[in-house]
Curated annotation (Swiss-Prot):
Subcellular location: Cell inner membrane
InterPro entries assigned to the protein according to its UniProt record, in alphabetical order: MFS, MFS_dom, MFS_trans_sf, OPA_Antiporter, Sugar-P_transporter_CS, Sugar_P_transporter
Underlying gene: uhpT
Name of the protein in question: Hexose-6-phosphate:phosphate antiporter
Induction line: Expression is induced by external glucose-6-phosphate through the UhpABC signaling cascade.
């Protein structure tokens, strides 16, 4: 029934390596664009809820608590699905899996739209459909990581994944325009258009995405990426390919028993406290504590996203220049984050505030990308989805939740771990950044050992 999700592996074509390498580019770009545009589109049917909240309050009389319940449903299913759905996707055609999940998510959001009548809503159906949409979207990032990793050489992996990572920045930035266009021009200003129009776009993108590309050059008979680009197959891939390990055995051995993956999981929790803490509370801090105008506060939020866009592109490339030392590069960025948080906290005018938020966006999204890239370097390709998913689960269920609720309570004056007020909030951000540095430093050491070991193996092979 779902045969189109199965992997396709064709015998390697009897052609010279140079010819197969030239044939690689077109199917790679098709596959890359599918996961890039597909993941971007997922944000169009995710962030539209944030944009529509004020209209949902005025049109249907929903309370902040009710809106919070709807959002919480998405966060829980998204966090849980990061591991469950990504585990299922491993061993499947992950390029096909992403547009298929996009289609299912779009259908759910159409159901979400239908639960809003002309003058009344069904809160239960809204929570159910939005939660289901989150569950289906949860594997988008993991499928993208898996697909891109199978197509690209290790020495360029950070660059390709870094460029893909801007898809969510572009999707988040474009969500407002798409939602408002749907409401104002197609539904006479009614809030329901903010959900129906993006969902239709997502359906179209999803069905087109199913037609192009695949999850690996092996699907076209081109051989593995390592063979095409003259790289040694990783130790983890050699081990899983030379044995008849089941998917569960691979998951247990290379994910659950993998010390590096657990280090990255906890590092990701700390990083999400920093990232979401800044993202969630920057406008409130600027207005309440720094006494800046609401317009300047919003400008700072926008510059944080702009800095993230630039940083996402640059940090992956820098880690490639460092020969794949993702942990080391992440530690440098995290140290700079701590210094910049001090400037941001004590900003004496709007220009320092705006500059510090741009710098924080630039710096924070470096480690976020590099934690994911580091994870795929320590697992076989058959476990990339689950490895990326499990760190996402921890980040959303613990880091994201603490950043939104815990930091909010601290800023509001409620003591949490002895911290209170805005000074306590920034202390929590500093502690989280330091915790992330400590864990990433350990990862950097283990990464260095792995790089040197693989270099020695390659030298022996050449000799």
């Amino acid at each position: 029934m779902l045969a189109f999700l199965n992997q396709v592996r064709k015998p390697t074509l009897d052609l010279p390596l140079e010819v197969r390498r030239k044939m690689w580019f077109k199917p790679f770009m098709q596959s890359y664009l599918v996961v890039f545009i597909g993941y971007l589109t997922m944000y169009l049917i995710r962030k539209n809820f944030n944009i529509a909240q004020n209209d949902m309050i005025s049109t249907y009389g929903l309370s902040m608590t009710q809106l919070g319940m709807i959002g919480l449903g998405f966060s829980i299913t998204y966090g849980v699905g990061k591991t469950l759905v990504s585990y299922y996707a491993d061993g499947k055609n992950t390029k096909q899996f992403l547009p298929f999940m996009l289609i299912l998510s779009a259908i759910c959001m159409l159901g979400f739209s239908a639960s809003m009548g002309s003058g009344s809503v069904s809160l239960f159906l809204m929570i159910a459909f939005y939660a289901l949409s989150g569950f289906f979207q949860s594997t988008g990032g993991s499928c993208s990581y898996s697909t891109i990793t199978k197509w690209t050489p290790r020495r360029k992996r950070g660059t390709f994944l870094g460029f893909w990572n801007i898809s969510h920045n572009l999707g988040g930035a474009g969500a407002a325009g798409v939602a408002l266009f749907g409401a104002n021009y197609l539904f006479d200003g009614h809030v329901i258009g903010m959900f129906i129009f993006p969902s239709i776009i997502a359906l179209i993108v999803g069905f087109i995405g199913l037609r192009y590309g695949s999850d690996s050059p092996e699907s076209y008979g081109l051989g593995k990426a390592e063979e095409l680009f003259g790289e040694e197959i990783s130790e983890e891939d050699k081990e899983t390919e030379s044995t008849d390990m089941t998917k569960w055995q691979i998951f247990v051995e290379y994910v659950l028993k993998n010390k590096v993956i657990w280090l990255l999981c906890f590092a990701n929790i700390f990083l999400y406290v920093v990232r979401i803490g800044i993202d969630q509370w920057s406008t409130v801090y600027a207005f309440q504590e720094l006494k800046l105008s609401k317009a300047v506060a919003i400008q700072g939020f926008t510059l944080f996203e702009a800095g993230a866009l630039v940083g996402t592109l640059l940090w992956g490339w820098l880690s490639d220049l460092a020969n794949g030392r993702r942990g080391l590069v992440a530690c440098i960025a995290l140290a700079l984050i701590i210094a910049t948080l001090g400037v941001y906290q004590h900003a004496s005018n709007e220009y320092i505030y705006l500059a510090s938020l741009f710098a924080l966006g630039f710096l924070v999204f470096g480690p976020q990308l590099l934690i994911g890239v580091a994870a795929v370097g320590f697992v076989p390709k058959k476990a990339i989805g689950a490895a990326d998913g499990i760190k996402g689960t921890f980040a959303y269920l613990i880091g994201d939740s603490f950043a939104k609720l815990g930091l909010g309570m601290i800023a509001d004056g409620t003591p949490v771990f002895g911290l209170t007020g805005w000074a306590g909030t920034f202390a929590a951000l500093d502690i989280a950044a330091i915790g992330c540095i400590c864990l990433m430093a350990i990862v950097a050491v283990m990464e260095e050992r792995k790089i040197r070991r693989e270099k020695k193996i390659q030298q022996l092979t050449v000799a």
